[in-house]
Amino acid sequence: MNKNICLSASHKQNNRDDPIINELINYFGNETFTIQSTRIGVPVVWVTREQILDFLIFLKKKPNSYLMLYDLHGVDERLRNNREGLPAVDFTVFYHLLSIKSNSDIILKVPLLEGDISLPTATNIFSNANWYERETWDMFGIIFHGHPHLTRIIMPPSWVGHPLRKDYPARATEFNPFVLTKEKEELEMDSLTFKPEKWGIKHSNHKDDFMFLNFGPNHPSAHGAFRIVLQLDGEEIVDCIPDIGYHHRGVEKMSERQSWHSYIPYTDRVEYLGGCVNEMPYVLAVEKLAGIVVPDRVNVIRIMLSELFRINSHLLYISTYIQDVGGMTPIFLAFTDRQKIYNVVEAITGARMHPAWFRIGGVAHDLPHGWNMLLKELLDWLPNRLEHYVKVALENSILRSRSEGIASYSAKEALEWGVTGAALRATGINFDVRKWRPYSGYDNFEFEIPVGNGISDCYSRVMLKVEEIRQSIRILKQCLHNMPAGPFKADHPLTTPPPKERTLQHIETLISHFLQVSWGPIIPANESFQMIEATKGINSYYLTSDGNTMSYRTRIRTPSFPHLQQIPSVIRGSLISDLIVYLGSIDFVMSDVDR
């Protein structure tokens, strides 16, 4: 085994030579912030809460500006042992900014002490900071002064406590037995009653009373347990309030009680249609922490499975969109067609929707005999079938008239709300992580990135997904014809058990193997980050290791969360029927939103 790989895990990057660091020094001075060395791959800068808004404004307005607030969340640092490079801090709030123009990121961190965990809101700078700040307060109790509506967003309104704090229990057995009394039931029902005045919404204008309508949480066009409270003037939507959290299962909290390996099955279920696509950012982030380099065969196998699941998810999206507009037949065709993809996935992984097949350092096992024939049959059949969807439904004049120009927004609006994926590319912005920040060997493949003509509307979004399927087919053909030989797992002590004969000769090897199998591998203390182009936009994992067998903090940034936050800004002034079409064009599942 290559022992140098283990040593590389201690290597840290401070990105001091990054141009943005020099710009910050020239503008603010080098005494106003400190740089943290991590394995994230982007500059990480600590600033005070008094300065955070000035830094955000500067970064957003400078040339090659960071126009997108990609993520915002928190960390409870109180139980963290490895604090090298950290200031005095009990809680951290981090702001992850993304510049499409310069294809670069920067992370700003604000340290907070337990006596005063508050800082000013960034909602006046980035519109999408609203939900992220609400989630951070919900999970950690961190207060954002000046926020327009700092209330629960993931947890129920009556919830007590902040679940991602380290002193909050992580198991049901650590709580008192749950008893639902009549009084508590009435309290819960009352907390779900929509009170317009709490949201700053008026009951009427100077001449008419508004009607309030609950859309969901069990409406078929809501695509999951999702509620939108509509303020209506007749059929026109005056305003609306999306209400999420019904699908929340605490997947980030679960990571704190699972080993690095045993957490992999949970990643499948964050966006339950994506399968192996969701495993990719997690295993890549762990491999970055541990300094593991996987064989070429592993990279191509991972890409092959990811593109199979991308096609599978896109077929469901396209067919359900057609159903939302009024066409019933394609949805039944799609479920039949998707089974062909599941048959290939099952033959390779042994499972269908949630394979949990990627491993830290490789995949669970090698490709089975005959995999290439199964994939070839699928690729020979799929292109003509895709054209059938286009000609029969997507080019239909009724569908086009109900889709074109509906729920449209510009590139500027998309960046402001943190939109990624096909919805962003439909505005004309050519940004696909597989091309611009290639991972797992995507830079060795030839494929194009479909881009829209400047305005993202319902029709352009769905048609881009059609073209993305064509490009995924192109990638899969290259996997079929150019699959490298070699091992399916890295020869690394954190990923691969030692040969049996070695364990019989060296007791230390057997002990190490026993501990890794029973307790799990110990990943070096550090922080890492990995984003990927998932089925619905950019998905990423931000991992913090404290040098233990489990993650200290796992932050999962999903694309659907900001996409639903954008709904009110897009749909105001439209009809309820347009809302149905718009929701169908977003491509989301609530597990991806609520996590």
Swiss-Prot record:
The keyword Thylakoid does not apply. GO terms for cellular component: NADH dehydrogenase complex; plasma membrane. It is a peripheral membrane protein. Keywords: Cell inner membrane, Cell membrane, Membrane, Multifunctional enzyme, NAD, Quinone, Translocase, Transport, Ubiquinone. Its main location: membrane. SUPFAM superfamilies: HydB/Nqo4-like (SSF56762), Nqo5-like (SSF143243). Residues 1-185 are annotated as: NADH dehydrogenase I subunit C. Residues 209-595 are annotated as: NADH dehydrogenase I subunit D. It holds the Pfam family Complex1_30kDa. PANTHER family: NADH-QUINONE OXIDOREDUCTASE SUBUNIT C_D, NADH-UBIQUINONE OXIDOREDUCTASE 49 KDA SUBUNIT. NDH-1 shuttles electrons from NADH, via FMN and iron-sulfur (Fe-S) centers, to quinones in the respiratory chain. The immediate electron acceptor for the enzyme in this species is believed to be ubiquinone. Couples the redox reaction to proton translocation (for every two electrons transferred, four hydrogen ions are translocated across the cytoplasmic membrane), and thus conserves the redox energy in a proton gradient. This is NADH-quinone oxidoreductase subunit C/D. It comes from Baumannia cicadellinicola subsp. Homalodisca coagulata. The gene is nuoC.
